[in-house]
């Protein structure tokens, strides 16, 4: 058996995998254990009481975190006319139609989010095989196909996260960076949980939010005490 790294030994010593942590204690411990040479993200996994095999129980959407994610986001926008001007004014890095599509076909993918106005989908639709596998295809369900281009760009720049359950009914996303103050991480988590509650499928039965775990990019997961989350859930 290979030896554990010093970092992993410390994590194993300090993390009780059977314990449900109070939220404040969890953030404090995550900060203590975040010793990577880069600023780690704080990630969350939310187990939902849904049947992911049923299309009407899948959960997908987007929400703006009040304190952002700590990442700078580059936005590409497919639109034209007045919306193109609005996109530029809102801070989009790339704005265009066929010219932007040509850049993408040539492998120029220097962006994190793609937004499109409805009239531009005739162009964007031809890029499905490129954008789809990368999770970049615009979709009205997460607000990236919209007539309100300026708002969509502003939201993306402000720290909007997109979420979608996996085949096990779990939402994986980020709520900020480990150097955020604990209260900012908590408020970001509150925003996510509130959005997930609003997105609850009508056909989902029983306990909806079953478990919440927090971790950093290189750290172990901490299970959160549900009673500590009563105000959120």
From Swiss-Prot:
Matching CDD domains: Ribosomal_L1
Domain of life the protein comes from: Bacteria
GN (gene name): rplA
Gene Ontology terms describing biological process: regulation of translation; translation
Pfam family, one: Ribosomal_L1
Subunit structure of this chain's protein: Part of the 50S ribosomal subunit.
Keywords on record: Repressor, Ribonucleoprotein, Ribosomal protein, RNA-binding, rRNA-binding, Translation regulation, tRNA-binding
A single cellular component GO annotation: cytosolic large ribosomal subunit
A single MF term (Gene Ontology): tRNA binding
Native organism: Hamiltonella defensa subsp. Acyrthosiphon pisum (strain 5AT)
Record function comment: Binds directly to 23S rRNA. The L1 stalk is quite mobile in the ribosome, and is involved in E site tRNA release.
Family recorded in the similarity comment: Belongs to the universal ribosomal protein uL1 family.
Protein name as catalogued: Large ribosomal subunit protein uL1
InterPro entries in the cross-refs: Ribosom_uL1_bac-type, Ribosomal_uL1, Ribosomal_uL1-like, Ribosomal_uL1/biogenesis, Ribosomal_uL1_3-a/b-sand, Ribosomal_uL1_CS
PANTHER family hit by this protein: 54S RIBOSOMAL PROTEIN L1, MITOCHONDRIAL (PTHR36427), LARGE RIBOSOMAL SUBUNIT PROTEIN UL1M (PTHR36427:SF3)
């Amino acid at each position: 058996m290979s030896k554990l790294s010093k970092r992993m030994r410390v994590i194993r010593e300090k993390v009780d995998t059977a314990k449900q942590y109070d939220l404040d204690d969890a953030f404090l411990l995550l900060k203590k254990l975040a010793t990577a040479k880069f600023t780690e993200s704080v990630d969350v996994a939310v187990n939902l009481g849904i049947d992911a095999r049923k299309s009407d129980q899948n959960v997908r959407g987007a929400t703006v975190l009040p304190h952002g994610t700590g990442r700078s986001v580059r936005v590409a926008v497919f639109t034209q006319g007045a919306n193109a001007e609005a996109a530029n004014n809102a801070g989009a890095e790339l704005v265009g139609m066929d010219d932007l599509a040509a850049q993408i076909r040539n492998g120029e993918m220097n962006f994190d989010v793609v937004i499109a106005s409805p009239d531009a989908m005739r162009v964007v639709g031809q890029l499905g095989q490129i954008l789809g596998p990368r999770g970049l295809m615009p979709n009205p369900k997460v607000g990236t196909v919209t007539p309100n281009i300026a708002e969509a760009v502003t939201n993306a720049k402000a720290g909007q996260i997109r979420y979608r359950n996996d085949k096990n009914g779990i939402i994986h996303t980020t709520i900020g960076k480990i150097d955020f103050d604990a209260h900012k991480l908590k408020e970001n988590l509150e925003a996510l949980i509130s959005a997930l509650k609003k997105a609850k499928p009508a056909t989902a039965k029983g306990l909806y939010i079953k478990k919440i775990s927090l971790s950093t990019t290189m750290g172990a997961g901490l299970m959160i005490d549900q009673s500590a989350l009563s105000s959120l859930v």
